Amino acid sequence: LGKVGAKKYMLYVMDYGAPIGFRIAAKHPERVQGLIIQNGNAYDEGLRDFWNPIKAYWADKSAKNAKALSDSLLTIGATEWQYTNGTRNKAVISPDNWIIDQSKLDRPGNQAIQLEMFYSYGTNPALYPEWQAYFRKHQPPTLLVWGKGDYIFPEEGAHHYKRDLKNLEFHILDTGHFALEEDGDLISDLILQFMKTNS
């Protein structure tokens, strides 16, 4: 952002991108005009059952735990599940999503990269109190849209934002983790109106 000369911006954060965005926001609160949060976690309560094998890897970065993650989370079945679990109608989700994603995941050496990303995500929970303090102190205007069927980042985590953010537009949608797949038009309309109101 510094290289492109961005002085003021809104941050759209989702999944792995949420911790990156929250790090930026906490470091440069004066630059953030608003947050758009889509299934991106900042609370311990938002890391539920899905995360148990990943937490085991954080605690013990062993070959056994790495294999457990590879076998359960880096397969074509797991990638398809991320797109279809919790959705209203799996039939409307294009298979191109998981086929293309998996073709990239299966590149030589990429599995090791994904495992390292799982491991490095473990640095985030320790920063949750800092991000929550940022929310409370600076109160950035925030649009939150969240698929209630998301098993990776369950709805419970979304509701905790209400505790810290007062200027919060809050939407729980009847869809899954990749909420744009079923509700892209609705979410884009919400984003445009939010940006118009808060720019």
What is each of the regions a protein language model found here?
Residues L1-Y12, Y16-I172, L186, L192-Q193:
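Flexible "cap/lid" subdomain of the alpha/beta-hydrolase fold that forms the substrate-access gate
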Residues T175-S188:
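Catalytic histidine-centered segment of alpha/beta-hydrolase-like enzymes
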Residues I191, M195-S199:
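Short, hydrophobic alpha-helical segments
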